[in-house]
């Protein structure tokens, strides 16, 4: 039996990888424009980082982490998210001692043991940004505007930004008390997970996808009902700034997010029709997280987006479109001497920066031209023993179906000129 890839993972093959590369280039471009710098953290961390940072009551820590003991008997976890790692790096490398704010972004794989379904994988990829060192509403508005701008450039349609304030340690206890009082008469009807959340973190019950729990929480007190003056003013200013930036948003009082570290601002970006999950970005403010992982009190805000979901949404928005040709020129060589000469030509063109290819299988003229079509090459250059003897080469435009004979000595100059005229 052939060995297969682990469940919940995927092979990104040629033709698909190019879509990922394009998305990554768009991400890096907009991050440069907004003044964010890339950070790369380890794929595995000490398990305690996520227990303390993400929260021991979360589904991620309780059910979804890939955790193991290494050969030194240390508990290690493959990172399930990026924010805790960035905060750890911020503290460990004393970034808090330099100019603030620190504006960072990351791109990389994350790991969660989830039931694989449409839009969800056990190894998945996230792009995220984190801003540390400033607590102003304008920073919240900037990170939301960044992702809104990115999705607009990617051509995504039917987008919705949902925003909420989940309060702070000063005002959240009052909401917790009111929510527990509301849920207490039907506590035993809650799902098993929500019953365990009732005492420690009842706010998470509002995030439960169980239909019974959703029905029970209809009409429950929201965090907006009990915000302190500071949180209320922060949320009001955020909405004003989003409107000024022409970001279309909706206040969603039931939005609480699934991680314990959020304070004040929480937000999601949703899109329709990409499978089981419609959220393609989520984030919020985490002013206590840096201190939780051993640093000084430091405000922070960020978001993460699932790149697989964004690519799926982009595919739906654009439809099935043919990508750019993998090769600009395919050299069709027939015969040993022609293959040697053709290989030398292709090598010189590649060194100058032209995407060029040559058949490696010694196939027939017909088979090589079919291969050139498959990679959507713009041109095929045909060189056989007869052409070599005459000192010519045939250049065929595969887009127009036209061809010309060129002196072999002039070929590279001519094809390079056409390459530049095509905007390369």
UniProtKB/Swiss-Prot annotation:
Protease keyword on record: no
Predominant subcellular localization, coarse grouping: cytoplasm
GO cellular component: a single term: cytoplasm
Compartments, record wording: Cytoplasm
GO BP terms, alphabetized: histidyl-tRNA aminoacylation
EC number: 6.1.1.21
One annotated GO molecular function: histidine-tRNA ligase activity
Reactions performed catalytically: tRNA(His) + L-histidine + ATP = L-histidyl-tRNA(His) + AMP + diphosphate + H(+)
Keyword field: Aminoacyl-tRNA synthetase, ATP-binding, Cytoplasm, Ligase, Nucleotide-binding, Protein biosynthesis
Subunit structure: Homodimer.
Family to which this protein belongs: Belongs to the class-II aminoacyl-tRNA synthetase family.
Protein's recorded name: Histidine--tRNA ligase
